[in-house]
């Protein structure tokens, strides 16, 4: 959680800084590298400011700082109660749903990819698909033996869920942008 939180936090911070420069001076973001990868074009859409007209990356800065702190706390030996984990699960799920919504819009509606956004997608996908089986195994969703056993069974194989999620995104990008690798 700590390393993933820091990687996503840094990407969100970079997007926020470059989005600010784009709005202030019109300076092209560093991730505008070709006709397909254009963070600047993505940042100028309504999808980039969904909640309260606040840039999405500001939510990422706050959210991933929390994720990194949770990871650091666990590494330091903290034990957190079930309510905390339920709220963490709700936050991670909301972020996952939001990021997959943003992925869909970037690929199929906006028509541009954002490299830093893709880093956040990749990191959060890994966090989510490891966290869910861990939470099941830890009894966060209740002590139903079937849920606990299911989590214990899936946790060592959570990488499969991550690969499937990455494959769906990768195939969607290849289908939607068939000329992407011909540049």
Where are these regions (language model features)?
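Membrane-interfacial helix-loop segments of redox and metal-homeostasis proteins
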Residues: 1-183
